[in-house]
Amino acid sequence: MNVILLDKIANLGNLGDQVAVKAGYARNYLLPQGKAVVANESNVKVFEARRAELEAKLAADLAAANQRAEKIAALEAVVIASKAGDEGKLFGSVGTRDIADAVTAAGVELAKAEVRLPLGALRTTGDFEVEVQLHTEVKAVVKVSVVAEA
C-alpha cells in the first residue's frame, strides 16, 4: 500500500515522502495516528496544498523538543528512592514510568514512551545516565540517582 507521510517516521521516511508499506502497518498504525494518508490523486493534491502548514508544524515540534532537551540537560541528577536490600539490590525495579514521573516532578514534562532503557529496568542503587528521545532527531540524557529508602 502506498502512503504519503505527514510526519517524519524513523526507518521509513520524512514529511511528504511517498512510501510503500504493508497494508496492516498502514491501516493499524499510520492512518489512525494521522501519520500518513493513502497515496491517491485527491490526497496528493490536498497534501501539496497543506505542505507548508505541515512543514511549519514539524519545525515547531522540533524547536519545542530542542527546548525540552536544553531543560533536561540543565537538570541536576533526578533522585528516585526505592526499597533496597543490604547490597544495593532493589526490591522491584525502577522503570520508564518512575523515571518519567521523577523528571516531570523536577519541572520538565516527560512521557514514559520517551524514556529509553535498552537494558531493561534499573534493579540496583547507584547513578545512571538514561537516554530520552524527545523527537526523532532530538535525544537527551537524564542523570538518575537511585537511592535506598531509609
Swiss-Prot record:
Keywords: Ribonucleoprotein, Ribosomal protein, RNA-binding, rRNA-binding. Belongs to the bacterial ribosomal protein bL9 family. It comes from the Bacteria. The lineage of its organism: Bacteria, Pseudomonadati, Pseudomonadota, Gammaproteobacteria, Alteromonadales. This is Large ribosomal subunit protein bL9. Binds to the 23S rRNA. Gene3D superfamilies: Ribosomal protein L9, C-terminal domain (3.10.430.100), Ribosomal protein L9, N-terminal domain (3.40.5.10). One of its GO terms (molecular function) is structural constituent of ribosome. GO terms for cellular component: ribonucleoprotein complex; ribosome. The gene is rplI. It comes from Shewanella sp. (strain ANA-3). Coiled coil: none annotated.
